[in-house]
Amino acid sequence: MGPVDTSQRLARLRELMQERKVDVYIVPSEDSHQSEYIAPCDGRREFISGFTGSAGCAIVSMSKAALSTDGRYFNQAAKQLDNNWMLLKRGFENMPTWQEWTAEQAEGGKVVGVDPSLITASEARSLSETIEKSGGSLQGVQENLIDLVWGKKRPARPSEKVALHPIEFAGKSFEEKISDLRKELQKKKSAGFVISMLDEIAWLFNLRGNDIPYNPVFFAYAIITPTTADLYIDDEKLPAEVKKYLGDQVSVKPYGSIFEDAKALSQSAQKKSDGDASTSPSEKFLISTKASWSLSLALGGEKNVEEVRSPITDAKAIKNEAELEGMRACHIRDGAALTEYFAWLENELVNKKTVLNEVDGSDKLEQIRSKHKHFVGLSFDTISSTGPNAAVIHYKAERDTCSIIDPKAVYLCDSGAQYLDGTTDTTRTLHFGEPTEMERKAYTLVLKGLISIDTAVFPKGTTGFALDAFARQHLWKEGLDYLHGTGHGVGSYLNVHEGPIGLGTRVQYAEVAITPGNVISDEPGFYEDGVFGIRIENIIIAKEVKTTHGFGEKPWLGFEHVTMTPLCQKLINPSLLTDGEKKWVNDYHSKVWEKTSSYFENDELTRNWLKRETQPI
């Protein structure tokens, strides 16, 4: 998708800024629940800038506009931003962060405005300090200015019905989960926990929704105290069976009343403090470090609130046995779907000489997936990319502008699905012609990185920050690298990107150790701008493993892979693999055949393709 002319939108925004005496205005990507993926009505940063990537921040002054994003989106942003915008490349030397750039624009006593519901309290504090150093000030602007510019064309807020997530898939009742949470509150001597993250609420109550594309969540807040459980959700979203399920253990309140109730809790806490300089820990409410600034302010700020890494996020990341079994099962079905798709695609392109574009491919894959048991929908926009487009890390094909799939070029497909028993995310890079030596070399180095993570053995307490280099080492030796993390947590029929764990250089990945039951992606890559891109992705489960010595008398961990989709034999250069790596590839392919071949008893085309692609190297 090319640039959108943002001139009129920026002019109107600047008029509104002037009326409110705001000199610089910040437009984050997130919604009021700090969601990574958002509903169309919350796509404010995309609306004002024209940039459609999932991560980034827009900043508008009276004379300039800047968009900051990370390495996944540099190419995409360069193509989508019009001449009104400058691109701030996150992590580049001599390139200011968006916070630093904002502070520069605020020099001389200028006012920086932001909707306080769209940034966290800690972000607001940090940003305020940075801006004050340059002589400016940060101000919360309650009325969102982008919404005013958008006007009647802004999409309506979704109000989809909520559904029960059966115990056979959840593995634990919501009553047990709330009981566990209350034990954590007791340890912290806290008055309660105010929950704002949508996937945490869905997981806690064993409910699923459809308010955000690809993410089975719903708009809600919740407050859990030692004796009460309140769910803030619009009543029309709850079918009778859900109301009956929640029973008298959960009080249902209007979504919009959360701030009023938070303020009442704040006032109650202030009364209990009885004039003391600070409220005792037992009177403080916990909020996630990802809760909004506006929610923190409603609760009375730091005096009444303790910001913590959410205990729900930690619990949700450690999958129980029912969830793990679901992840194993859905990845077998998903692997069968991908195998059928790749066999079909090769036959169409090579044997039938059919002309197919990238969207034709992604549509066919969704059609194949939809036939499988427990399928609900996709877990993110399928990345179906040919040739140079594969070098755009988060490429999104649009029917009117996408490319014809070239059988003589690399084809990268990153896709996933939501099933009732789990969430999938798999990337495979293929070639239907004769790959170049550089393509084979890059693919094999990436494969070596994937195997290094898959076979890693490490002591309890090791973080994903520490493991990240395992995947990069083979590329680094050749002076190559990739500008994205190596892996992210994956939800269980929830968000495909799930914290707090992952593999990469993000600060949060250095704070949380890998734990048995964590489900993580393993996805190294390599991208040559304008030429080709390589990425291979499996989903892995952390587990305890036996070692020869067990140094330190503590558990040692490793991984189990659950993705069951063949690698591309044509792109592997066996001479670059060790004997151990060749054995891994052969063992993996043997397992893929064992787990998925039965799906193709009556499909000779796919069965033959699978047999060929799983032969020993």
From Swiss-Prot:
It is an enzyme of class 3 (hydrolase). Pfam families: Creatinase_N, Creatinase_N_2, Peptidase_M24, Peptidase_M24_C. The keyword Ligase does not apply. Its cofactor is Mn(2+). GO terms for molecular function: metal ion binding; metalloaminopeptidase activity. GO terms for cellular component: cytoplasm. It catalyses: Release of any N-terminal amino acid, including proline, that is linked to proline, even from a dipeptide or tripeptide. One of its GO terms (biological process) is proteolysis. Keywords: Aminopeptidase, Hydrolase, Manganese, Metal-binding, Metalloprotease, Protease. Binds 2 manganese ions per subunit. Its EC number is 3.4.11.9. It comes from the Eukaryota. Mn(2+) 2 binds at D414, D425, E537. Mn(2+) 1 binds at D425, E523, E537. PANTHER family: XAA-PRO AMINOPEPTIDASE 1 (PTHR43763:SF6). Catalyzes the removal of a penultimate prolyl residue from the N-termini of peptides. Belongs to the peptidase M24B family. This is Probable Xaa-Pro aminopeptidase P. It comes from Blastomyces gilchristii (strain SLH14081).
